């Protein structure tokens, strides 16, 4: 199911890029002092999904928590953006562009992994047919643009669904004595990440 999830992310991104070029939108978030969205670079294609909270995640990835209003944004996602953005920047891509690309890749890979974990979780709870249906509905849900953008939604979906997967998998293995192995991992994933 991860392939379907990744394919749909690409389609959503293409749709957003087309709309971003043809539709004038109201976006007051670009008034931030440093938006880190280059205007004349290959990142123009990615600009269609760098809106609203994405700017704050990029700001935290670049400069850390400089302003009080930025403290509302959980640090895991910006830390991953910074880590992978610096690796991508080694290829010669501008830092801003590499951070945007890193954020997109993190979101897309997290969503693909969340789709796979949704399928596995649903197989434990339901039949395989219902597992496929629920996963396809998860993949094509109307909030798909948030799963494709530089938001924590995909990463947190992956972590939450993975935690639930281990919880229910542990319940099915409990009689076999294997819960001792999965309980600490399940609790860590579901409760502390």
Regions found by a protein language model. Give the residues of each.
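Residue-level signature of the transmembrane alpha-helical core
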Residues: 2-6, 10, 79, 104-109, ...
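Intrinsically disordered, low-complexity domain-flanking/linker segments in eukaryotic proteins
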Residues: 28-38, 89-96, 171-185
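Short acidic/glycine- and proline-prone juxtamembrane loop motifs at membrane-interface regions
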Residues: 143, 148-155
């Amino acid at each position: 199911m991860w392939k379907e999830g990744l394919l749909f992310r690409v389609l959503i991104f293409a749709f957003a890029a087309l709309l971003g070029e043809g539709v004038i939108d109201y976006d007051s978030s670009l008034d931030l002092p440093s938006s880190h969205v280059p205007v004349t670079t290959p990142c123009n294609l990615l600009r269609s999904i760098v809106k609203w909270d994405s700017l704050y995640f990029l700001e935290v990835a670049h400069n850390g928590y400089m302003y009080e209003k930025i403290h509302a944004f959980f640090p895991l996602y910006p830390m991953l953006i910074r880590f992978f953005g610096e690796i991508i920047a080694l290829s010669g891509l501008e830092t801003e562009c590499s951070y945007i690309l890193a954020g997109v890749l993190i979101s897309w890979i997290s969503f693909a992994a969340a789709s796979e974990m949704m399928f596995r979780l649903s197989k434990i709870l339901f039949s395989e047919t219902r597992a496929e249906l629920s996963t396809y509905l998860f993949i094509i849900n109307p909030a798909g643009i948030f799963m494709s953008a530089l938001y924590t939604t995909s990463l947190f979906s992956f972590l939450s669904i993975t935690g639930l997967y281990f919880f229910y998998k542990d319940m099915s293995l409990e009689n076999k004595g294997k819960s001792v192995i999965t309980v600490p991992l399940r609790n860590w994933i579901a409760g502390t990440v």
